[in-house]
Amino acid sequence: MDNLKINRQMIRNPLHNSGAVAVSFVILFTSMLNRRHLRIKILHVLYAFYQDEERDVVKTKKALDHSIEKMQELYLLLLLMIGSMQSFAIDRIEAGRKKQLPSPEDLHPNTKFVTNRPLRVLANSKNLSEAAADGNIGWGNHQEMLRKIFRGLLDHEEYTTYMASEERGFRHDRECLIRMFRKHMINEELFQDNLEELSIYWNDDLDLAASMAIKTIKTIGEADEDVELLPLWRDDDDDRQFFEGLFKETLAQATENESYVTEAAANWDLERIALMDRILMKMALAEARTFSSIPLKVTLNEYIELSKYYSTPKSHGFINGILDELFGKLKKDGVIKKTGRGLIE
């Protein structure tokens, strides 16, 4: 990936300022990856590809596959981070008891956090430790960062409220742990700064990976002694085929789809059309032409949404107009063909 340099701020959002990003959570899935995220992954590497003089397809595909692997690594690291908080809490309690002049609080500590049941499941998870070992994944030299995150947690409202509450119960433990993770751990500026240094992919992956970590915690039942990890892909191959096919066909159809865009945008100054917009439209056309079971409206809406986040403020209107015109024309000409219930007119 050394020669496929990605402008991280442009890819994340060319209009957003840098700095810690508050993570939001709106998506829950039965696997880690979803099609919108796959589209974004492909968009990232194609943006780098078209900026690179070599335009090496093989190298670009390797970078794409690597970014998917890094997504899974981040998911596991987040779960490991949550589990590590118990170890720091235990160390703190033991250190307090060993003081020469321990306070009553040191001698009789509040153990509500260290006995939080979902936290204990994560901290002692065989499935998680084996998956991490198999991928050689761990926080390694970043223990001090985790320790500082734990220290910050001690003063966070979610933690102090939880510890002061007399409420008990598995559901209470689980909900409070999720809030501590969501509101403090991953939104800690130190964590986000380190994340950017560890991998160029992870700031864009954090939202989804954190959603997957929360989904995993929510699956922990009261009687569970271990956690079931989410698979990277669903059991069926539909999403994997979509991923492979969209990347391949966007490049294979690039020249032809570029000509369609050029024709439809005849009244526009083509040199002023942003590279990001051109890539989005070529991806959308490749998707519409290749995947007969995906409704055109779905494809259109997906790329309009991506343009709102990754391109200029006016791009979504431009892309909407061009794609709407081209989809209608190419469907009429038989270039775009749809099959399945509700897709054949």
Each PLM stretch: what is its role?
Residues 16-19, 318:
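Generic detector of intrinsically disordered, low-complexity, polar/charged segments
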